[in-house]
């Protein structure tokens, strides 16, 4: 285990509270001004990083002390991450920027098991955290020669028009069975499929309308997308899905697929472009288009359902909002949920929050959690139709993890046997959440060839053949499902 770097931040509350201010997050009606003062850090490793792997902040909210623990989101980018834009004559320009020492963090509030946080530390602190069921935002005021930040509740951000924002989901069938209750699901007794980690290698495309919306500032667009994906990855952690950004495209010379007022037509054209062009030069599982287009009928996002591993249909489109990154991230999480086969929530679905990610209408309140219905349907689908998500089992190379492992962040890193999250959240009996080691007597914690914490017998089919392919079999000595040596 690594020694966690502690950085204490003393936040002195300004003698008055602001009544109204315009921030990147919008027009805020009520806020506190605070001044982060960084106490000298503990000795660092010989190799210096601009952004620490782990930090701790202390401040007060409503007069009560809060301790915020942050850990760098080391799984944010894939090893082969690339960025592509286009010259004025349409020539493709691809770069591979260094992204290991980035400034995007996840975290928690000490002594609050239900807390979450997503923070950018690139230029001051910017992001949100959940404390005792309420969402707060922190953002730099960007005053000359000042470290002043604003802390405010989401309810104090002026909302846009109250018209219901709708999600559009394209079905490939006319009807489907309703979501079953948890008691009706036929889960394996050991739950090994439930605990199996899955990986979505994601490409995000900023269309030409978004490029012009931000005055051609590719750096700003990239930063916006990093922040969105940092929130998105946190949304999917409880589902044991790791989302890694593997590519970013900016259509700087013009639209490369049709973008119209019709969300259906725009989605269809984007899917055709992905199959025809993007897949031929960039390996990935899913592509999402971030667009500056305002679609008709109050559509905020559109996606195909149960399409995650389909060549054309593993796509979604999401409307960009300049000031509301968390809002865009939650819509994208919603559309990817449809790609995974998850339906809209019914009125009876709950998620211990004011709104859930898969609500049919988009709430102004941040929706950071999937409902019980969404989780149950997802688990049911991967048990009864595992081939529909076959592309999500190829783990990204661990060489992209360049900093020491952090136990409890859900990511299996070098030196760990398993990682099922913080002890309060871990539900895997094969994994000791406090040490990220296997529990006594366990041979494995997850994997297609792991059953009841033990390796499955040699010769057990772990991956059924598709088409002219061959079945894959467990070897009896590992939890993974090795490729059949007879594969051509």
Swiss-Prot record:
Residues that carry a glycan: 258
Subunit structure: Monomer.
An annotated Gene Ontology molecular function: metalloendopeptidase activity
Motif extent (Cell attachment site): 466-468
Protein's name in the database: Zinc metalloproteinase-disintegrin agkistin
Binding sites annotated in the UniProt record for Ca(2+) 2: 406, 409, 413, 416, 419
Domain Disintegrin: 404-488
Signal peptide: 1-20
Functional description taken from the UniProt entry: Inhibits ADP-induced human platelet aggregation, inhibits bovine aortic endothelial cells (BAEC) migration, has anti-angiogenic activity and induces BAEC and human micro-vascular endothelial cell (HMEC) apoptosis. The metalloproteinase domain may act in hemorrhage.
Keyword Magnesium recorded: no
Organism name: Gloydius halys
Record domain Peptidase M12B: where: 198-394
Binding site for Zn(2+): 334, 338, 344
Propeptide positions: 21-195
EC numbers for this chain: 3.4.24.-
